[in-house]
């Protein structure tokens, strides 16, 4: 888990610095070719990747992604970006497609993959950045359900997000889980109802929820400036 190194603090060079391993559970916002489409052991997966494909945005190198910048801070190191472009928290994709049991569902990406490698590694921190595609695909919110989830429940967002957080806390008991919400004003973020749902579910599980503001985007996706803003806003919370 976390490692203790010599301090990088010029005001107190003898103070120890604890380096925490960070895993990202995300969608297109957290992808990058050659990073998010391989697992912890380097095995290729079938994840879709948004960045840095030509013409998407000016995020043309991995060091321009929010998560890479965050993990360059002295107190963090990247465990893995377990991120699949287009993925949904629930088991319902665009046009009502059922993605139960596939890596297009966040819920499936907990524990071991088909190679026997843990999707999220051995993290100290897990940053869950999802819900955008559920909202854009108009997945039904459903009811607040905190146990005994049915297949029908998990095709709706609220029960699925609840199960995701519960599963992460159970499977990675030594990790701290945070949620990142893509705004609360609608496209190119999530709607107020989605944002409120995420916040309510986070409160139930004692998960800190980071609601992003003023993220520069092109075609609904963060630019380099947007990535910098995400990094800064997330660091303000997890870097405390």
Tell me the role of every PLM-derived stretch:
Residues 3-18:
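Bacterial Sec-dependent N-terminal signal peptides
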Residues 21, 78, 174-176:
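Residues at the starts of beta-strands that form the adenosine-phosphate
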């Amino acid at each position: 888990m976390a490692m203790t190194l010599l301090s990088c603090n010029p005001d107190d060079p003898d103070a120890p610095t604890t380096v925490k391993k960070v895993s990202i559970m995300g969608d297109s916002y957290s992808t990058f070719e050659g990073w998010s489409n391989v697992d912890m052991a380097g095995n290729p997966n079938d994840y879709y990747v948004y960045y840095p494909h030509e013409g998407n945005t000016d995020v043309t190198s991995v060091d321009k992604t929010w998560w890479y910048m965050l993990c360059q801070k002295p107190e963090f190191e990247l465990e893995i970006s377990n991120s699949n472009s287009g993925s949904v928290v629930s088991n319902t994709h665009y046009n009502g497609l059922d993605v139960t049991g596939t890596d297009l569902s966040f819920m499936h990406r907990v524990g071991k993959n088909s190679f026997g490698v843990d999707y999220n590694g051995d993290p100290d921190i897990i940053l869950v950045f999802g819900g955008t595609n559920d909202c854009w695909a108009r997945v039904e919110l459903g009811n607040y359900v905190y146990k005994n989830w049915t297949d029908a429940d998990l095709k709706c967002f609220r029960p699925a997000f609840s199960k995701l957080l519960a599963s992460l806390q159970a499977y990675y008991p030594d990790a701290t889980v945070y949620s990142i919400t893509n705004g609360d004003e609608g496209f190119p973020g999530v709607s107020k109802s989605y944002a409120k749902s995420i916040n309510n579910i986070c409160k139930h599980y004692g998960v800190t929820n980071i609601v992003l503001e003023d993220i520069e985007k092109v075609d609904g996706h963060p630019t380099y400036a947007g990535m910098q803003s995400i990094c800064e806003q997330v660091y303000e919370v997890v870097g405390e």
